[in-house]
Amino acid sequence: MITKKNLAIFEINECDFKYFLKGATKYQFPLIKNYFKKKNKITTFTIDKEEGLNLDPWVQWVTVHTGIRSSRHKIYRLGQKLNNRTKQIWDIISLKGFSTTLWGLFNSNLRKKKNIDLFFPDPWSFTQKVYPQEFNDYLYLPKYYATNYPNIKLSKIIYFSYKFLKKVIFSKSFFYILKNFFSFIKIFSLAGLKSFNLYFFLDLISLEILCKNIEKKKSDFLIVALNSFAHYQHNFWDDDRFEFIYFWYLNEMIKKINYLEGYYNSTIFYNGFEQKKIKKKYFLRAKNPKRFLKILGLNFKRIEPNMTTGAQVFFDNDKDKSKCINFLKSIYLLDVPLFDVQKFKKNIFFKFNIYLYKKDFNIENLTLLNKNKYFNYLKKNNAKGLIYNNHSMLKKIFDNVILMKSTSEHTPKGTLYFKNIKLNKKQIENTKIFSKITNHFSL
C-alpha cells in the first residue's frame, strides 16, 4: 500500500484533448477515453498572447515550474538558463526530503543533486547534463536529431543510434520492442523516418525506460515531459495519411503512463496550453544555421539552434556581435525585417519572419526578373515580400534555406486532468500550479 506523500506529473506539451478523444473513438482505442474519464479536470490560462515571444512552450513551462510570469522570469528562448534566485518546483520539493525524477522538461536546470534520483534534460539544452551519467547514451540520439534537424549527417545518426540501441538492448526495455516488433514494422512502413515518427518512437521508449527504472527505484516526485504530439500537430496535422500513427502511439503511451501512475496516489496530466489547427503555411528555416551565418560572412563563437526558425548566437567580442546584428537587421521585407534579431548581454537570438501559404512557388531561385511576380504572388496569398538590393547576397540566403510547413498555432488556454490533489477552482492561471504542487508536499 502506498502511504508516503507522492505525485506523478505528465506534461504532454500542447496536446489537443478534444482531438485525443475524437481519434480514440475513430480508431477504436477505448483505453484513451477511459483514462480521461477517471480524472477530474480544470482549465488553465496564461496572460501571454504573442506566439514567437512569450506564448511558446519553453516560456510557459518555465512559468509553470517557477510560479512566476514570463515578464519576471524572462526566459523566452530554448536553452536560456534561469537565474539561480528563482526556485523551480523540484528545488523546493527535493529540499523537503522527497526524492525526485525529472525527464525532458523544457529549460529545466539541475542545481543540487541531493534527493535527485534522475535528471534527464530536454534535448535542446546545451548546458544541462544527464544525472546520473549512466543515462547519457539515451540522450545522444534525440539531442543530435533535435539540434541538427534538418541537416542530419547519416554517419552521426548511425553512431548515436548504435549507442541508444545498445543501451536499450542491454536493458529490460528491449523486450517491449520485441513484443511489439510487428507493430513497429507496420508503423515504420507507413511513416518511415519522418521526423514525427522518430519523435513519437523516442517518447514511447522514454516512457518504457522510466517504467523499468521505477521498478528498481521509485521517486516520491516524478515529472515527465513529452513533445512528440506537439511536433506532429505543428507540422503534420493536415495529413490524414498519418493520423492512425498518432493515435497508435498515444494508446501505447497511455498504457505506460497508466503503469507509472500505479506507483502514485496523486497524478496530473497537463498540456501546458493548447494548439489550434490552421490553414497550412510555410516558414523559412536555415538548412544549417552555423553554415548559414558563415556563408553570410559573419564571425561567431558558437551557435545553439532552436526547434523552429532561429538560433542563439554567441561571440568572442562585441565587434563581431555588432556586425552580425547590423547585417541581419539591414535585410528587409516590404515593411518589416527579414530577421527578428534580439540582443542579449553575451549573445543574440535571430529567426526568420517570412511565411508563405503555398509551397509551389520556387522561392529559392528568386531573381530580379521574377521579383514583381514574386511580390504579386505574396500579396495575393496575404504574405510578405522581400526587398533587398544586393542580389548576390540574396541568392546566398535563399540557396541555404528550406521551407517548413506549419499546421497549428498556440492558444493561451490549457487543460489539466488530476487525481487526489487539491485543485478546487474550475479555472486557474498557470502560475498558480506551482503552489498547488509544492503545497501538496506540505500537507
Predicted regions and their residues:
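Metal-dependent active-site segment of extracytoplasmic phospho-/sulfohydrolases and closely related
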Residues: I9-E11, L31, Y246-R285, L416, ...
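Short, structured active-site-proximal loop/turn typified by the sulfatase FGly-forming signature C/S-X-P-X-R
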Residues: F20-V59, I68, R72, S99-W103
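A structural signal for short, well-ordered beta-strand segments and their strand-loop junctions
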Residues: I9-E11, T44, S99-L105, F221-A225, ...
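Acidic/histidine-rich catalytic neighborhood
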Residues: L260, Y264-D316
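Membrane-interface soluble catalytic domains
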Residues: M1-T3, Y76-L82, T86-D91, K96, ...
